[in-house]
């Protein structure tokens, strides 16, 4: 067997295995918003003070379950079946008015409603 194939195989196995043990159901994430803004129905842009928040990845509820403080106080975001890979630290959640995307510690959220649009980004760490 050629040395290049061995090295390529080892590198591939390390890459594939590196994220698998890093995340799973039951993990708790602590997040700090990097941007938070809204657009009113009149088209006015409003910038909000970035907040901290936390959530747990709950397998029983198939959801992101948020803590008791902050913008997402006690909210439950149901994960999208077929677009949820906790072991790879990547998932999507959505409902009638909002969409959430999470991958490798990056959190993106948008909500549309009768009062306008809310959009935010955050960096999250697992503890």
Give the ranges of each region predicted by the language model.
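Short, solvent-exposed loop/hinge segments that bridge or flank secondary-structure elements
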Residues: 25-63, 100-102
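Sec/Tat signal peptide C-region and signal peptidase I cleavage site
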Residues: 19-23
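Short, solvent-exposed aromatic-acidic interface loops
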Residues: 34-38, 67-74, 114-115
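Bacterial N-terminal signal peptides
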Residues: 9-17
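Edge beta-strand at a domain terminus
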Residues: 113-127
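Contiguous, well-ordered beta-strand patches that form the walls/edges
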Residues: 61-100
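Bacterial N-terminal signal peptides that target proteins for export
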Residues: 1-8
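Short, exposed beta-strand-loop hairpins at the edges of beta-sheets
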Residues: 99-117
């Amino acid at each position: 067997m050629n040395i290049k194939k061995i090295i390529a195989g080892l590198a591939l196995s390390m890459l594939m295995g590196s994220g698998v043990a890093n995340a799973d159901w039951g993990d708790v994430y602590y997040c700090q918003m990097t941007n938070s803004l809204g657009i009113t129905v009149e088209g006015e842009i409003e910038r909000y003070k970035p907040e901290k928040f936390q959530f747990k990845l709950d397998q029983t509820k198939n959801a992101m379950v948020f803590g008791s403080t902050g913008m997402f106080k006690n909210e439950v975001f149901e994960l999208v079946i077929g677009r949820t890979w906790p072991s790879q630290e990547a998932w999507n959640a959505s409902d009638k008015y909002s969409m959430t995307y999470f991958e490798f510690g990056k959190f993106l959220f948008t909500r549309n409603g009768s009062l306008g649009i809310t959009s935010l980004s955050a960096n999250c760490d697992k503890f």
